[in-house]
Amino acid sequence: MKIIYVSVFSIWLVLGLVLTAGAQNKVPNITFNHSNVFDRTCSDTLKKPISPESLAELDRIVPRLRTRWETDGPKLLKTTAAIVGRPWAFSEWKYAMFLCDGFHSMSFPPLLDMKTFVPSTSKGEPESDEVFIAVIFHELLHIYVDDCLEGAPNGTTKFLEKYKAESSTVKNHLHLFAVEKLVYTKLRMEKYLKDTIISEKKLSPGPSFTRAREIVDLETPETFVRELMLGGK
């Protein structure tokens, strides 16, 4: 039965690659800049100064990170659309990079917390460029998954209902982690996933992320991606 299911999914994936060949090449243009205004206003409001050294360090690494995204970003987004069979619903997204304490990266409003990537503000060794790319991809996938499931009956799916007792953090990452794993595997970018998982363990929601990945592995990533293909139906 499992062999049959995998075969059906494989056929569906091939059809998706063909039918969305045009759409998958149209990926959103993603840009990011250090928001000095955000950092200044935030630090003044919270009474938590940011050193000029840290701000200068962030500005120095931005060009390198842009170059890295230009190399890795488009193929991650194209492969996502190809695997799921649904195009990205927006054409552009702009992120504000910041160092102010008290906020974290999020999909909306589009914010990138850079404290762990800057030597003077990271607690220990700064995170790698691979983790930076993974953070952007992660936040974009939140929007993509939400768009795919927008028409789900009663706002849920079979597997979200099955795991309704789990925390919202776990449920909000099931489909995301499924797509993430298939995309990184398809592109042979497993190091990005490995580094991301290590980085996640340092965060307060780390246990919830671990639990979500356990569920995805148990049910298989293809199971959750199929729900995205069907719009949650």
Predicted features along the sequence, with ranges:
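Second-shell loop/turn segments in exported
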Residues: 61-70, 122-126, 159-167
